[in-house]
Amino acid sequence: MRNRYLDLLRAAATVRVVVYHSTGWAALTVVFPAMSVMFALAGSMMAASLDRYGPIAVERRLHRLLPSLWVLVAVAVPVMLLGGMAWDWKVLLWFFPVEDPPAEGFWLEGLAAMWYLRDFLWFVLLSPLALPLFRRFPLPTLLLPYGALVVITLSGATPHLVVRDLALYGGAWLLGFAHHDGLLSRDALVGRGGRFGRGGRPTRAGKPSVLARYRWWLVGVLGTTGAVWALTHPGPRGLDLNDIPLANALWSAAFILVALGVAPRIAGRRTLTVLNSRALTIYLWHVPLIIMVVRVAEATGLPVHGWVGITWRLAVVSVLLGIVVLLVGWVEDLAAGRRPTLVPGGSRRTVPVSPAPAGAVELARSAP
């Protein structure tokens, strides 16, 4: 059974990302740290997949992720090559972007959000090793990415972008593991030593995990520390957490502990189904559409900034996204093994069967 609350969080994160990239409002990164929430939700789903399918879960997850990317690549890469981009073997990375592939012209900005897929691929590939390690040593494993980020920040080191992002978002992914294993809820009891059986469930009843018992203390410490660091180390755009990695990680951890530490009952809504079934398509295409709308506005003299500019741009981007979702969103259905539909969540029609007359039933029984 689907967890509609997690669907709600994923849908809210998707909408928040589109609104943030359309408006640039830094406050949104504080009110709802969407990227960390998306990584945490993905980590929880990855742990569930590994428990159910084993290492083959990696292939299944990639199978759901890559086809939608290839649709965008089939448009962007030929356009860039025809526009004069030099051929290089790194262009092939667009089909499996474990490192940033080359981009030029319009697509240099339009594909800027591809870092999420790059990091997602790395987390998926590392999860078969990370999940057993997390279950054997939960707290040390969880502290590792945060400790690495502190060292990177305080030393001023400039590691490879993948290494930096594994430190920045690795904690969120591992908190997703913790959510799947029930470590964020006081209702889930963990045996001595935090031992887990098959499916990541506790092997014997004991007491709530450390994360559950001290959750509100951790929320206070992490949130306060993240806020203080952000206020004393603002980035080029002020308090935009995307520019302040350490504050981003700490504040996001506090947010995730609150958001995933509860499990309210959410009624099913078709809007949630559509947003979740098309979340990847929306993410992949929203930045190119935003860039396109902004360039058209600048070329025609239409307002870009202020409430008027933001309102009409957001409306146009939403309409264009709806069109793209109708055109190529069904690829997500194929990748997930579902029957492709234009708009997910529709009820299946069944043909009512009228009861046969009693006489016909008796006649059928007496037939040879």
Which positions does each model-derived feature cover?
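Alpha-helical transmembrane segments and their immediate juxtamembrane cytosolic regions
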Residues: 1-368
